[in-house]
A protein has these predicted regions:
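Solvent-exposed, non-transmembrane regions of integral membrane proteins
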Residues: 3-204
Length: 204
């Protein structure tokens, strides 16, 4: 029927869009993709239309009796819920760390406002790792010290690199850039304690 054909077409469009967004993200960065694709009204509407059609098909055809189809449509709805949680409740930004300077907040990407962190973080040192025998950078590594809420006298040490994410209190820190003098470090901050987990559950 027309509804099924429309659902298939929208599925194909969504998959193609997500694939294209992956390449765009590699070329222009995560902030660009989120601002121009993931966090736009038309993208949310696309997800909403697909979810609505899938839900109608699920009810009208009693698809809950066919477990594989139920699992497929159910996972789609779970992914949509996770995406909406991320859209409405997540925070993203960046923090600039300097050696020996304690930071307790980060700057939000969209609003430019300072948002508090539930803990403090300090850069101990930053270094660039090179491929053996070359001057080609292999990794950027920030060595940090942080303290947990209510435990300021308890200092914990961690390192953040291109392939190593630091997670604490629902905040995820990614190594993104560094100062020209090679001393300061820039970290991307992502706060999404529920949305990411719900979305991953849908894919599983």
């Amino acid at each position: 029927c027309i509804r099924d054909r429309l659902l298939i077409i929208l599925y194909i469009c969504l998959v193609g869009l997500l694939a294209a967004a992956t390449f765009v993200e590699q070329a222009y960065g995560t902030d660009f993709v989120e601002r121009n694709i993931y966090h736009t009204c038309w993208f949310c509407c696309l997800w909403g239309v697909i979810a609505a059609i899938a839900l109608v098909a699920l009810i009208r055809r009693a698809l809950w009796r066919r477990f594989p189809i139920l699992l497929f449509h159910g996972s789609l709805l779970v992914i949509l819920v996770g995406a909406m949680i991320t859209f409405t409740g997540s925070k993203k930004g960046y923090v600039h760390l300097l050696p020996g300077v304690t930071a307790g907040s980060f700057q939000e990407s969209e609003s430019g406002r300072e948002a508090d962190l539930p803990f403090t973080i300090q850069l101990d040192s930053f270094r660039i790792a090179y491929y053996p025998g070359t001057e080609a950078p292999a990794d950027y590594i920030s060595y940090i010290t942080y303290s947990l809420p209510g435990q300021k006298n308890v200092l914990l040490h961690e390192q953040i690199s291109m392939n190593r994410i630091f997670t604490s209190q629902g905040f995820r820190f990614y190594q993104s850039s560094f100062d020209d003098d090679g001393k300061g470090s820039w970290l991307t901050v992502n706060y999404d304690p529920w949305g990411t987990g719900v979305t991953y559950a849908g894919y599983i």
